[in-house]
Amino acid sequence: MYKRQPVHWAGRACEMEKINKIASEHNLYVIEDACHAIQAEYKFKRCGSLGDLGCFSFHPLKNLNVWGDGGIITTSNEDLANKLKLIRNHGLINRNTCVEFAYNSRLDTIQAVIARYLSLIHI
């Protein structure tokens, strides 16, 4: 399975109906880059929820930042969500069993607190 990655830019959404139709016809995942589209909508649905995965960056130069690098991925696909949960923590299914090579992709504590505070204020 391959992917297509539309990039929503400056709060303007891509033509997601067309993109999703093409992806469906060719058995592709749609991974949205919604970093510049916090709270932007396409046909009354939020950007980042229109494809298989939505990606948001917390980098200092993006619309929503947490004083350092970080990000979040959204999905309504349970299989992809389970895969992401696995790879976000070294591929571990428990303390002693690693089933896939992966990284530690969690925010540090300070960034998580800042992100939570900012989300309560702005979103």
Where are these regions (language model features)?
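Conserved small/polar residues in nucleotide/adenosyl-binding loops
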Residues: 1-5, 121-123
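Generic secretory/membrane-interface signal
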Residues: 2, 26-27, 63, 102
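Catalytic PLP-binding core of fold-type I/II PLP enzymes
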Residues: 3-5, 10-44, 77
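Active-site region of PLP-dependent enzymes
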Residues: 37-43, 50-121
